[in-house]
């Protein structure tokens, strides 16, 4: 279970908080759909849960974030990703390595997996998103949509209890959107918790809860 309690966020120089007294709970297999206009705080909320705020982006932040009885707040970002996977809206912020295979294996190197287990996860993730023919490709040569799928495959391979998704289908169309929807359905059926900012109502139809941050 994820418990988010009494979150408050205000950026330096702003007189009004982005949100305050924000509270919700999610059980295993639930998806929270974040809605509202641009700038209402959807990405900010994901950044708070991931630890980017306040560890990398400084802001006045308080509140409790509890995942399966574990307090996430004191956990450094590099350790927090053992418990959550985060797909940011701009894939270039998450792609660092010269080959797709290395990009996917990076998140698993400190997970205590055998080489065989790592390879199995990577193969499954690339097949889920149609990237199996791109193992040796330089990520910089991928299209924007392919980069987006690469980051989603990266998240899938992590196999964490919690997934944070920021516009997962932007720059995607047709078959690629269907792959993402199928993946989300599989996550939920396996008891994962998902928080998603997304404009596509077809994906929003998977939500068990909706939080409109624009209200």
Predicted regions and their residues:
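The feature captures the beta-strand-to-loop junction immediately N-terminal to the Walker
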Residues: 35-37
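ABC ATPase NBD Q-loop/coupling interface
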Residues: 51, 64-79
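Catalytic Walker B motif of ABC-type/P-loop ATPase nucleotide-binding domains
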Residues: 163-167
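Conserved ABC ATPase "signature" region
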Residues: 116-134
């Amino acid at each position: 279970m994820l418990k988010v309690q009494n979150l408050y966020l205000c950026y330096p120089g702003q007189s009004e908080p982005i949100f305050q007294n924000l509270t919700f709970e999610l059980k295993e297999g639930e998806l929270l759909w974040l809605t509202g206009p641009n700038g209402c705080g959807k990405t900010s909320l994901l950044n708070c849960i991931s630890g980017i705020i306040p560890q990398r982006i400084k802001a006045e932040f308080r509140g409790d974030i509890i995942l399966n009885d574990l307090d996430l707040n004191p956990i450094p970002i590099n350790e927090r990703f053992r418990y959550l996977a985060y797909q940011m809206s701009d894939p270039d912020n998450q792609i660092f390595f010269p080959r797709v295979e290395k990009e996917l294996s990076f998140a698993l190197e400190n997970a205590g997996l055998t080489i065989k287990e790592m390879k199995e996860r990577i193969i499954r993730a690339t097949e889920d998103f149609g990237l199996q023919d791109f193992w040796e490709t330089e990520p910089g040569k991928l299209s924007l949509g392919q980069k987006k799928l690469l980051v989603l495959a990266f998240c899938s391979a992590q196999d964490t209890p919690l997934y944070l998704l920021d516009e997962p289908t932007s720059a995607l169309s047709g078959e690629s959107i269907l792959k993402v929807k199928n993946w989300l359905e599989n996550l939920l059926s396996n008891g994962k918790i998902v928080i998603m900012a997304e404009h596509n109502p077809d994906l929003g139809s998977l939500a068990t809860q909706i939080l409109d941050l624009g209200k």
